[in-house]
Amino acid sequence: MEIRIMLFILMMMVMPVSYAACYSELSVQHNLVVQGDFALTQTQMATYEHNFNDSSCVSTNTITPMSPSDIIVGLYNDTIKLNLHFEWTNKNNITLSNNQTSFTSGYSVTVTPAASNAKVNVSAGGGGSVMINGVATLSSASSSTRGSAAVQFLLCLLGGKSWDACVNSYRNALAQNAGVYSFNLTLSYNPITTTCKPDDLLITLDSIPVSQLPATGNKATINSKQGDIILRCKNLLGQQNQTSRKMQVYLSSSDLLTNSNTILKGAEDNGVGFILESNGSPVTLLNITNSSKGYTNLKEVAAKSKLTDTTVSIPITASYYVYDTNKVKSGALEATALINVKYD
């Protein structure tokens, strides 16, 4: 009886030496630069592969690609959100036999825009570059260990923990008596951003005799003059000069008549001011000191719009306007409005 016990102990000591296993934790990092005109193309794909060499592997082992998860990446304070979809180039298990220690695996990533309300998994903060750990992982762990680790990873994310924390926990769960092989990805995006800068515009009206001014509340029908607001656009996309984002053009001023968002008055209260018109309708200017009444959208350019030229022209007409005949007197008139371009 005593001999059998000793033999059993001896067998337990010897058997693990020949047990097939890999124990290393290896990782590789790749870099993905999202194209500057991504706002136009809306999709980008890249493929990566790597040859892992795990010298700890003995006998025969099976390396299993784990199912990858889509990742939402936030850039520039999460104002840009990208969806990263990962797929293995070969989903089949990899068999290492006869003490083989190296194998090659790869994956593809497809980048598309994410919804504005999508929950961000990995954020670059205020920047445009971020390193994402564990975008794709392989392991020699048993099926039960892999299943348990996958559930643990999902619960970790649902519990609100960070991507890195969940990936580290996931790797640790897989690494129990098994090899773990991970792909990390650094993503960078410096988007081409269309800007349209307005030229200064001076509209000078010809003098008008006081006798030809209309009654209070009317614009003069003579000596009106048209000018063109010119926007000079840069960073257009592709050969068709497409815009990367939506733009709106409007006017604002601090020289508005009290209780009016359409009448510009000079420094002196002499009963006469100016009214601006676009396509035959009065232009509502944003009151710099009181923005509650809104403004007229002089021009809207949608994202991906094709511009025939790098300039945008917006015609506008200026006319005299009498707001109080009792104050009318001769003299120079001058008022200023600002040309604003709003981007979305």
From Swiss-Prot:
Induction: Expression is negatively regulated by H-NS and subjected to cAMP receptor protein (CRP)-mediated catabolite repression. Part of the yehABCD fimbrial operon. Could contribute to adhesion to various surfaces in specific environmental niches. Pfam families: Fimbrial. It comes from Escherichia coli (strain K12). GO terms for cellular component: pilus. Keywords: Signal. Disruption phenotype: Deletion of the operon under classical laboratory conditions does not result in any major effect on E.coli capacity to form biofilms compared with the wild-type strain. InterPro entries: Adhesion_dom_fimbrial, Adhesion_dom_fimbrial_sf, Adhesion_dom_sf, UCP030811. Belongs to the fimbrial protein family. One of its GO terms (biological process) is cell adhesion involved in single-species biofilm formation. Residues 1-20 form the signal peptide. This is Uncharacterized fimbrial-like protein YehA. The operon is cryptic under classical laboratory conditions, but is functional when constitutively expressed.
